[in-house]
Amino acid sequence: MLAGSAAAASQQTAGFALGRTGGNIRPFTVTIAAGGKVSVSGPVQAGRTRLTQAQVAALVKLAADVRFGTLPKTTNCAGTLPDIASTFVRVGARTVRVHGTCIPRYTRLWKALTAAVKLS
């Protein structure tokens, strides 16, 4: 098995989470289990309660494509006001937090995750 494939398999087993924290807005967390079950905590709603294995696999592939494992664990984007909340994405055991919108690879994964669960 290739190293990238092993990492992708590990990420798929552990699932995903995304959310918002800090700032002056209520935090939330959305969790996508490896089996596709979607759970929500906080003031948001997910339009899907379960993703198919194909959808989970596509998210795992995207995480690999954006090289999620190489993103810095914490980024404070220049010019972002302190009262703006930070967002986070967890893939497997690795969590990345970003305050602002200065990392396009992170933003691409964030948007894919929110679209997959139909976050509102």
Residue map of PLM features:
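Solvent-exposed coil/turn segments that connect beta secondary-structure elements
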Residues: T21-G23, G35
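Short, flexible N-terminal segments of the mature chain
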Residues: T29-G47
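Bacterial N-terminal signal peptides
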Residues: M1-A3
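Short strand-coil-strand connectors
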Residues: N24-R26, S41-P43, G92-R94
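Residue-level marker for the onset of beta-strands and adjacent loop->beta junctions
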Residues: R26-F28, A85
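Short, well-ordered, aromatic-rich surface patches in folded extracellular/luminal domains
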Residues: A6-T21, R50, Q55-A57, L62, ...
